[in-house]
């Protein structure tokens, strides 16, 4: 199985992932990610694990991320930081989630230059 890096989204100078991107990468559903977040909400810190985007900032984001249909009609949006993606991997606790998280850290969150073409990874499955 090949993993393709998600579309790069940056908010306030921080690379983030949408709930849909995390779910797709970790091989689960968006609903499972949302459930785990609400179930463990006390462990997530706004600004550290996730960023809430609303108002004019969200409108600007929608204009720059035209491929992200998952939040086209959202009034507010939670975007997950590297540390938030870690908490989701911990909640899921699957081999795939851990493998993908490690890959995202190396090639998505900490990548310094823009990629000209998608980067893919072979997974064990």
What are these regions (language model features)?
Residues 1-123:
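An anion-engaging/catalytic patch
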């Amino acid at each position: 199985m090949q993993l393709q890096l998600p579309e790069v989204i940056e908010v306030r100078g921080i690379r983030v992932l949408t709930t849909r991107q995390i779910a797709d990468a970790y091989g689960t559903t968006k609903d499972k990610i949302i459930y785990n977040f609400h179930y463990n909400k006390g462990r997530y810190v706004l600004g550290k694990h996730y960023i809430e985007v609303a108002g004019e900032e969200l409108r600007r984001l929608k204009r720059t991320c035209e491929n992200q249909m998952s939040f086209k009609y959202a009034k507010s949006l939670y975007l997950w930081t590297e540390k938030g993606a870690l908490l989701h991997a911990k909640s899921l606790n699957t081999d795939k989630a851990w493998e993908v998280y490690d890959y995202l850290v190396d090639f998505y969150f900490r990548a310094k230059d823009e990629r000209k073409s998608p980067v893919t990874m072979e997974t064990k499955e």
